[in-house]
Amino acid sequence: MFDQCRKVFCRYQTYSIENHVKEKEAYQNYSNTKLSWWFRRDMNHGPSGCDDTIDISEYDAYYLDQTASKKNEKVVYLTFDCGYENGYTEQILDILKKEDVPACFFVTQTYIRDNVAIAKRMKEEGHQVGNHTIYHICMPDKSYEEIVQEVNGCAEYMKEATGYAMDPYLRPPCGEYSARTLAITQDLGFKTIFWSMAYMDFDVNNQPGVDFVIDHFNKYHHSGAIILMHNVSSSNAGALEKVIANLKAEGYRFASLNELQ
């Protein structure tokens, strides 16, 4: 697997060694202090507060549709992080298809490798498939070369395995980032997508429950929300149809990430 990824990385090196060195050195001017994304919930359905250590907008990074939020436009974005399969993704896709709702699935290369048919189905049914790196790495801990390999390698593998291009969006694994990693991601042609709404749904042995998920959405949904969910969650799979129905009943529509500006 590593040799295959290294070959993918090499195919992206179309510039000279001299230019490569200059490019690598350029990122040394950016802080690589590791930050972990956080947000502050608003009980009144207002926009979430967020980590403002870095102005992420300078790097084509988003956590909220700011335009929709300012206009109080009832639009939300569903996103799912997919590190591995736990038997619920096709159920999620069935619900999204039934409700005619788009989503973005952030996948690792290992997820694609083990679930090619599901990854193809995501694209065939009109969803976006974003980048979650090859091995779900902590990006600030990696060298420039390793980041390029992880990001471009995942995108290349998506195309080779499914025949579909990966959409130009990346979610940093574990929400860990720095000014340096945001700059590199931007220069690789990807927009970084954080989130303004999430909950503890990723531990398959400690699920929050269907009622909790429905109640959480009822309490904290807001205009322009980018919602983080995990595909491995039985609670998400069980609650999703009701969550969508409730939001539609309040006049919300579900948008694709390409609407972000």
Residue ranges and their predicted role:
Residues 1-79, 85-91, 98, 114, ...:
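N-terminal pre-catalytic segment of deacetylase/amide-hydrolase enzymes
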Residues 85-88, 113, 136-137, 176-179, ...:
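Active-site environment of divalent metal-dependent phosphoester hydrolases
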Residues 222-258:
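Catalytic grooves of carbohydrate-active enzymes
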Residues 81, 96, 129, 170-173, ...:
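Divalent metal-coordination and catalytic microenvironments
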Residues 52-142, 146, 150-159, 164-167, ...:
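Active-site beta->alpha N-cap acidic-glycine motif
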Residues 176, 181-220, 252-261:
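His/Asp/Glu-enriched short active-site or ligand-binding loop at hydrolase and phosphoryl-transfer sites
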Residues 128-135, 175, 229-232:
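Histidine-centered catalytic micro-motifs
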